From Swiss-Prot:
UniProt GO MF annotations: prephenate dehydratase activity; protein homodimerization activity
Subunit structure: Homodimer.
EC number(s) on file: 4.2.1.51
Record keyword Transferase present: no
Catalytic activity: prephenate + H(+) = 3-phenylpyruvate + CO2 + H2O
GO cellular component, one term: cytoplasm
SUPFAM superfamilies: ACT-like (SSF55021), Periplasmic binding protein-like II (SSF53850)
Residue intervals of the ACT domain: 205-282
Lineage summary: Bacteria, Bacillati, Actinomycetota, Actinomycetes, Mycobacteriales
Species the sequence originates in: Mycobacterium leprae (strain TN)
The protein, known as: Prephenate dehydratase
Region (Disordered): 286-322
Length: 322
């Protein structure tokens, strides 16, 4: 490709754009052509991911996890329920906010305040202490909150320093966050393909669909434990098809090319109703020991398709499930 097209949660000035700029500077965007890349702001995280599925973008940069509120549900749901996508890189940002206004506005003038819900949750205590009388209005991003101030729709906004600069606003208060170690993790998502090479400090992620029977979830998770693999996250999300049915997101330390991780994925493929591989990528995490693989079987062929970026390719004649 001559220009890599990357969709992200917009408009311009969001923390997501800042994360994308960091990934670009670190050389984490695959297949960047001679003409560089083109950033494309979208109105929502699902819109950014759907742009990749539809071919309008090569990659999407989206938030996936926050240290205060946990996982970003729209991102997880879209990755699990839509057609297959794969994570290729990640970065983490320290998150601090500014309270911004137009020039000439003081704290006493603030009657309405726009905030992205995730941002509002991270400055709730500060707002209660300093702007308790302001009416909180929702924004679909931090940059949109700043835009609402610039357009005169609200008096003030909780937003990022980048967005404030883009919209020519001034900060009444800067560096605001209730928890001093607030951080958000962002991922770069594309169509399925060969994962980045193993670095020794990698993360692997998958979504498990498990039959509703006693002991099935414990048995699935045991495939990691018996191999000494560190699970860094497990989370359930509703399938959206029937009440009381769930998908399970798991993140582990390691790479699909680590023997123990490969064996765990193959065991899950045999055991679970479905396994959606979300990728293996550099994440700064230490890995455990590796082992030599056993002779090939259907699960080995399935794993080979994941490594080749072809998760939907049919099994060879005589093979098991897809």
């Amino acid at each position: 490709m001559s220009v890599a097209r990357i969709a992200y949660l917009g408009p311009e000035g969001t923390f997501t754009e800042a994360a994308l700029l960091r990934m670009t500077a670190a050389g984490l965007v695959p297949d960047t052509g001679p003409d560089g890349l083109r950033r494309w702001p979208t109105e929502s995280t699902p819109a950014a991911l759907d742009a990749v599925r539809g071919g309008a973008a090569d990659y999407a940069c989206v938030p996936i996890e926050n240290s205060i509120d946990g996982s970003v549900a729209p991102t997880l749901d879209n990755l699990a329920i839509g057609s297959p996508l794969q994570v290729f890189a990640e970065t983490t940002l320290d998150v601090e906010f500014n309270i911004v206004v137009k020039p000439g506005i003081t704290a006493a003038d603030i009657r309405t305040l726009a905030a992205f819900p995730v941002a509002a949750a991270q400055v709730r205590q500060w707002l209660a202490a300093h702007l308790a009388g302001a009416e909180l209005r929702p924004a679909y991003s931090n940059a949109d909150a700043a835009r609402q101030v610039a357009y005169g729709q609200v008096d003030a906004a909780v937003t990022s320093p980048l967005a404030a600069t883009r919209w020519g606003l001034i900060a009444l208060a800067a560096g605001i966050v209730d928890e001093p170690n607030a951080r958000t993790r962002f991922v770069l998502v594309g169509m399925p393909g060969p994962p980045p090479a193993r670095t020794g400090t990698d993360r692997t992620s998958a979504v498990l669909r498990i039959d509703n029977a006693p002991g099935m979830l414990v048995a699935a998770l045991a495939e990691f434990g018996i191999r000494g693999i560190d699970l860094t996250r497990i989370e359930s999300r509703p399938t959206r098809t029937e009440l009381g049915t769930y998908l399970f997101f798991v993140d582990c330390v390691g790479h699909i090319d680590d023997g123990v991780v490969a064996e765990a994925l193959k065991a899950l493929h045999r055991r679970c109703a479905d396994v959606c591989y979300l990728g293996s990528w550099p994440a700064g995490l230490a890995t455990g020991p590796t082992v030599s693989p056993p002779p090939p079987d259907e699960a080995s062929r399935w794993l080979a398709r994941l490594r080749a970026g072809k998760p939907d390719q049919a099994s060879e004649p005589g093979g098991g499930k897809l």
